[in-house]
Swiss-Prot record:
Annotated function: Binds 23S rRNA and is also seen to make contacts with the A and possibly P site tRNAs.
Keyword Ribosomal protein: yes
Lineage: superkingdom: Bacteria
Family: Belongs to the universal ribosomal protein uL16 family.
Stated name of the protein: Large ribosomal subunit protein uL16
Signal peptide positions on this chain: none
Keywords (A to Z) from UniProt: Ribonucleoprotein, Ribosomal protein, RNA-binding, rRNA-binding, tRNA-binding
NCBIfam families noted in UniProt: rplP_bact
Organism: Pelodictyon phaeoclathratiforme (strain DSM 5477 / BU-1)
Subunit structure: Part of the 50S ribosomal subunit.
InterPro entries per the UniProt record, alphabetical: Ribosomal_uL16, Ribosomal_uL16_bact-type, Ribosomal_uL16_CS, Ribosomal_uL16_dom, Ribosomal_uL16_sf
Length: 139
């Protein structure tokens, strides 16, 4: 599972997901992409589940790029703990995804295969997504 090797601060504030994604909105590595339409926190487990679903369907043909990285720690207090006494300890890592962000890219497979692979990957994610084809793509 994806997570940073080391971080400057162990705990971060939650923050807000306002507006659209400013960067990472174009298909730049592969020919096909999976674009987020809604804002959400995508956990490292969800990213891994989507990656596995795509790789299995593509039967290890072609190449997959993961364009998001879970670099935000989410803290949680233990069950049945009274309020107060500080912030909980980091439990898992999330990637903050805003609308318009390209999350996955693929290349080296036919368009139909990529479409189905991304459809399977999208089922593993908690947001609505759209299949994107690079503008200069030729069959």
């Amino acid at each position: 599972m994806l997570m940073p090797k080391r971080v400057k601060y162990r705990k971060t504030q939650r923050g807000r997901m306002k507006g659209n994604s400013g960067r990472g909105t174009d298909v730049s590595f592969g020919s096909f992409g999976l674009k987020a339409i809604e804002p959400a926190w995508i956990t490292s487990r969800q990213i891994e589940a989507a990656r596995v679903a795509m790789t299995r369907f593509m039967k290890r043909d072609g190449k997959i790029w993961i364009r998001i990285f879970p670099d935000k720690p989410v803290t949680k207090k233990p069950a049945e703990t009274r309020m107060g006494s500080g912030k909980g300890s980091p439990e898992f890592w999330v990637a903050v995804v805003k609308p318009g962000r390209i999350m996955f890219e693929a290349d080296g497979v036919p368009k139909e295969v990529a479409t189905e692979a991304f459809r399977l990957a999208a089922k593993k994610l908690p947001i609505k997504t759209r299949f994107i084809v690079r503008p200069d793509y030729e069959d």
